[in-house]
């Protein structure tokens, strides 16, 4: 029995903030960088007014093929390939609902870069309903909720500038080598320990 690994996409595999930062700077006539986003909500981190936040979110929703054009984080392709040698991988990701092509583009992006097919992708904001042995996400709040529902699972915070201030007592890394080692030693869900 192999372990089942649930991977978030944005912030773990794809550089969502790097993709939307040019939109933010264009709309607001600013020069923010990804490092300026020090919490999960970019609107809160950048201290955007409600009108500014709405304008940016509308732009994200209206930008064709945004999800298809996001950059892959360095090391992610090789990291996923290595983990697939020892575990099942499913991508559990939220959709940007106002962007009509988001899910289609995300599926094509995952297939193109990682050879992950549509049967291995779950679109949901309710990630806690997904069962796995290891769950990797950049949103600390999502990890905590998943762990509440799967107390024998292993939740891994993927380190980013926007979660570095979060309180988290569990696994935390942005190293594919370290994640590989974590997955190697996880006992798959449902297997019994023989004494």
Where are the regions that the model predicts?
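Active-site neighborhood of HAD-like aspartate-dependent phosphohydrolases
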Residues: 1-54
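Metal-dependent phosphoesterase signature
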Residues: 30-34, 42-81
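Substrate-recognition element of Asp-dependent hydrolases with the DxDx(T/V) motif
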Residues: 66-72, 76-106, 110
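Substrate-recognition "cap/lid" segment bordering the active-site pocket of phosphatases
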Residues: 92-147
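Short acidic-hydrophobic, aromatic-tinged amphipathic segments that line or gate anion-handling sites
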Residues: 120-124, 170-181
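Acidic, Mg2+-coordinating phosphoryl-transfer loop and its flanking beta/alpha structural elements
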Residues: 136-177
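Short amphipathic alpha-helix with an adjacent loop that forms part of the alpha/beta core around
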Residues: 177-192
